[in-house]
Amino acid sequence: MANCVAVASADHAAVGLAQGFVQVSHGKSAPLRRIRPGDVVAIYSPVQVYGSRDGLQSFTALGRVQPGEPYQGRMDGGFSPFRRDVAWWPARPVRIGLLRERLSFTAGKTNWGAPLRFGLLRVEDADMAIIAAAMDCAAPFGA
């Protein structure tokens, strides 16, 4: 089992939460092929609305990747983004600013957001535990 942070706007993350999937990098398949069933995924939302610059900068969802491979979904306008099924846990959003000095991938870094630009970032167990605790996630972490 691995842990990763996936990047998606909060409005896109909300659709995934409601329908039980994750999609990243505006629907690209490559990042989703790097995660496996059983992996824990946290969604980091730099913005509330895709295409805006509202500066949300929050973790907005937390869950476990389910069995199966990435697949293409259907959206309006003929857009067919790649998705992966996730069982989402009850969790509250938390701003990354509250955690930045405690997470190994952001602590002490002036350009802390750079590793997140690729849409998916593997993180250590300790980092995911910090994120889950801050989100008040009651799911059995590591189970």
What are these regions (language model features)?
Residues 1-37, 130, 135-143:
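Compositionally biased, charged N-terminal/linker segments
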Residues 7-8, 45, 88-90:
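Pocket-edge structural micro-motifs
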Residues 12, 49, 71:
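Surface-exposed, flexible loop/turn segments at secondary-structure boundaries
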Residues 26-29, 45, 69-72:
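Short acidic (Asp/Glu) patches
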Residues 32-35, 51-57:
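Short, conserved, surface-exposed binding loops centered on an aromatic residue
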Residues 45-51:
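Short, charged beta-turn/beta-strand-edge "cap" motif at the junction between a beta-strand
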Residues 55-121, 125:
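Aromatic- and Lys/Arg-enriched surface recognition patch
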